[in-house]
Amino acid sequence: MRIGHGYDVHRFCDGDFITLGGVRIPHKYGLLAHSDGDVLLHALSDALLGAAALGDIGKHFPDTDPQFKGADSRALLRHVVGIVKAKGWKVGNVDATIVAQAPKMAPHIETMRQLIAEDLQVELDQVNVKATTTEKLGFTGREEGIAVHSVALLLPA
């Protein structure tokens, strides 16, 4: 059994939506990123790669590589799952915490869980996503960006 932790942050920029957990969410800002900016899926990918001792998403999908410009983070996550499975692991469960003052995540969390479970090829009860604020403290509290912490448990396949 292996445990990995993932963390990612993206700054807000001009835009009218963000993508989190594969869900397009209307917002007064977008997220600045080389890919689609899905900070949740990036943190989950890092947790999975970390648990399997396979580095991080920057190693596998460098932001200096033009082929990943605007990349769909769901496709990247599915690729990570393939790498992890090829090393003899399967997902036991994942848990993620979105840290954001806005937008409100509650209306979108179940859809995020469903899409993540689909991409990880696991049951819904193996995926947890929750959200919190920092009570208007720090960069997330000032609505400068979004952060996500995630944990993944891998089991021998």
Swiss-Prot record:
A divalent metal cation binds at residues 8, 10, 42. 4-CDP-2-C-methyl-D-erythritol 2-phosphate binds at residues 8-10, 34-35, 56-58, 61-65, 100-106, 132-135, 139, 142. GO terms for biological process: isopentenyl diphosphate biosynthetic process, methylerythritol 4-phosphate pathway; terpenoid biosynthetic process. Keywords: Isoprene biosynthesis, Lyase, Metal-binding. Its EC number is 4.6.1.12. Pathway: Isoprenoid biosynthesis; isopentenyl diphosphate biosynthesis via DXP pathway; isopentenyl diphosphate from 1-deoxy-D-xylulose 5-phosphate: step 4/6. It is an enzyme of class 4 (lyase). The record marks 34, 133 as: Transition state stabilizer. GO terms for molecular function: 2-C-methyl-D-erythritol 2,4-cyclodiphosphate synthase activity; metal ion binding. Its cofactor is a divalent metal cation. Binds 1 divalent metal cation per subunit. It catalyses: 4-CDP-2-C-methyl-D-erythritol 2-phosphate = 2-C-methyl-D-erythritol 2,4-cyclic diphosphate + CMP. Homotrimer. Belongs to the IspF family. HAMAP family: IspF. NCBIfam families: ispF (TIGR00151). Involved in the biosynthesis of isopentenyl diphosphate (IPP) and dimethylallyl diphosphate (DMAPP), two major building blocks of isoprenoid compounds. Catalyzes the conversion of 4-diphosphocytidyl-2-C-methyl-D-erythritol 2-phosphate (CDP-ME2P) to 2-C-methyl-D-erythritol 2,4-cyclodiphosphate (ME-CPP) with a corresponding release of cytidine 5-monophosphate (CMP). This is 2-C-methyl-D-erythritol 2,4-cyclodiphosphate synthase. The lineage of its organism: Bacteria, Pseudomonadati, Pseudomonadota, Gammaproteobacteria, Pseudomonadales. The gene is ispF.
